[in-house]
Amino acid sequence: MRRTKVIATVGPASLSPQIIGALVDAGADVLRLNCSHVDTDGLRERIRSVRAVRPEVAILVDIQGPKLRYSGEPRVFQDGEVCTFTFAELGLPESRSSGDGGLQVGQRILLHDGRIETVIEQVAGIWPDGNVTVRVLHGGALQTNKGVNLPDTEVMGSVLSDKDRADLEVAKREHVEFVGVSFVQRPSDIEEVRSLLGPTCHVIAKIERPQALERIDEICRVSNGVMAARGDLGVELPFQVVPAAQHKIARTALRNGVISICATEMLESMTTSSRA
């Protein structure tokens, strides 16, 4: 029996019975469903589609969490440029626009999943009508719906949205084996999810923020497993630090006797180099 298991993400292009069966036959041990791109009813349908074809395969439901996305018009930014965003354009909820968990001068805002780096020079107004002025450190083209990261801020209160809670209820009712919790920052985030799911579902903490990496031991103690989510982790940390962070996550999981998962960008290099 292989000690290392394979998780395969399935979506619209791979939800046919033939492809699901082929994925499992090829060695997939767990099929992952990403809640970021499907509503709650669609999630239920996808779970049942997998169960109908291969009831023996485990399912991991990956909830969206507090992911921010740019909702403004496409723009191109030049190095050194000063520009302004509204809170609405950055997708900021009230808890991340003001107060203890809000934006402060000198903090970074990363756009297009880290490709564009800016630093805050001014925050004006109150949510939802306020705005933030930034200086561009590394420019580029920004398209609508691209990711926004705030590596220097911490989400205060619950990391769960109303959609996350509805998706967790579906996962519980459909007896899903694993749930991945996005943008975990502290052990209480996992405890909140576990209180909603009950004792039978395994809770996986996705480590993709610096705050979670600092608390990795405590998070491991309340989780069934941890995932080194290299995509967002590589955005919020300097890229040269990611291999060491990934190693730390895996070693801490082993020491605590919980599952360790390495995920995202696993095959991305093959799009440009088939021998990478």
Per-segment meaning from a language model:
Residues 1-276:
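Non-catalytic helical/linker scaffolds that mediate oligomerization, partner binding
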